[in-house]
């Protein structure tokens, strides 16, 4: 279960039920408000003085109409044409007064008004002085976003749910498709649909800066966006150039399969002639699952109907590599669970660098049970129902291995392009078929590094296969039970380091992430079969998804780590000897960075993601003697919006629970007042190795809750989450839900003791694993601390989730039945002690099946528990998007939370009928 993040990409636009009904008030800037406030006071004084100085000011006697008439005049924008303070009866009443009385009243009123005016002027001057000296008059547009701010400066517009759902707060970001030149040139990128350029161009990254004189000339690969074949027009949505840049593989008519995989029609485009031909000559409309170039640019391997084929360029001949592909046997592409949990990709094919061999995964899921996904509204297959079946839902059967069920059997196969045969290499000591996961495949010259684990991911073997001799051996075996009792996370970042004796590398090797110093650290293994590495990093921090790049010319390894702080990310470099680790990004300031390197590591796209306004720039790296820097994105519009809006005040810190320091962020409403008592919404994900508290810029749903609704929103990353040390991570092994919920409850009790918190209005919410944790926390707390909860697409019993993810943390139900029973959400009586909770789920969720929510509902029914609301979404998967569903999710969360904190749900228990209204009397 990869962390489900309700990022801006996840949110969809729609009707805002909390739209401001007086938009002009919010559109007004602070400067306008300040001007109007000051000028209104002046206008009042000017109006009084104007009337005092004119003949029209003829005060009346002391009858009861005077005050009302004065107020009416001061509030009237239209000047009267008759006597000031006059009305229809003024002449008749004034005729009854004596001239002497009128003059005495005039002087008396004048004296009184001057005294009052003097006092008001003095008060106004003093107030103006204080106002100006405090600089509180400054409009929000004068204050740049300050992530360190602990108070709100000025005033501004409110953050709205519409803005969040419409991605108005999403930082603009760019990605670079780095590509090596035909002769190995570094710093080239692939640009599609550039302004004023051909459709697909290879360009020197330095050409992005108009003032650069070093940039090489760009090369157009595809000039026109559309192409024609057999009198039909096509548009390529995917373009993949060959390494020699002479051909481009095009994909049209792309249709998604699962999270990463898709089907498409493929074409070969010739750069020189700008002509196209179908990849499958005899079947122009053939829909393929995968196609990939040989590194030598002379062949393409593809998968169709789960069988693999090879086409050599310059020939229409198709060579069939496998013949056993079927609905249950996959070649070169993963099945559902391997795509979702192991490869995080639709690709299970790997070319050797010399183009002589193809390694591929063969997956046999014959023994894997099926799970039906029902579609009641749509027909994702695109097929029309058979006559008489129009009123039945479409059902898609997925081979889905739940915890403890049969796993797919995987084997790594090799195809020898020259010999034309498929072979495998048997290695002694391998895991049994139903106890084997193949998690990573890396070519190392003529050899292949293969990582495999047992099915519960606590024993790993690194296997080295020589495809020339067709032999292999295990070069490293690690039992994590002997280290800390945890598990191995899957990684695809192992980097092959070829030998270069002249450059100080006598043997081939590889850089990998291993368990060291209570965390994940980088290690360099050389030669390939050496089980003892050179440690490149060590200490009380961790590397993140490392390494990022390797500079083979200068023996430098680049990586991202938490060295400065567990909630920050900075980029570093270190030599392959483990010496001279230095930062690439500015560590003197807080920062959360991501980085993308060119193929030769001489250039990089640096992405600053927070805590201030995000920006991006391309730089030359320490590997490049020619200095270069170009700002790609500054997000000026976002910075301007941040100035004009009242954003939440984000307070970061740690809370100590059972001797463990846990990171938190508390989002406070603008103009936070410590003398008030605020409701609190706890938002969390809490999944193993995940992280939600981090120093990034984000205006998301949680920000809206704080800045738009005026509640406090807290996130605490409890034990089991990432980057707080393996000791605090692996404590959850075999017992999911216990420590995570314990930490959320402890945090809630801590906040409940704060003077500015309303302890009777605490709620918690989450999606996916966060939904599970919401329910588990409510169950464990039983209404003592949390009163409300909102769970979206939750797991409720880990026996219902997929085997590879679940067993990594829980082992199998056969060996840990007590742990599975404890981890399930089953205590309906405890849930009944909460005031109320909300449950939402997509009916067509292929990841966390609807079975989870339905089973919980049945348990609640059996105990006659009714303090909950349910909303299901037909045909929606785990993201819940179908037919405006995502918008409704967040509308529902908002409305439900407001009702909860307003006490509406307190009125539901033991509801009694109101008295009947009397019928209106009939009219005559």
Swiss-Prot record:
A molecular function GO annotation: serine-type endopeptidase activity
Residues in compartment: Cytoplasmic: 1-111
Entry's EC annotation: 3.4.14.5
Membrane topology per record: Single-pass type II membrane protein
Subcellular compartments: Vacuole membrane
PROSITE patterns: PRO_ENDOPEP_SER
Pfam families in the cross-refs: DPPIV_N, Peptidase_S9
Region (Disordered): 1-104
Protein name: Probable dipeptidyl-aminopeptidase B
Source lineage: Eukaryota, Fungi, Dikarya, Ascomycota, Pezizomycotina
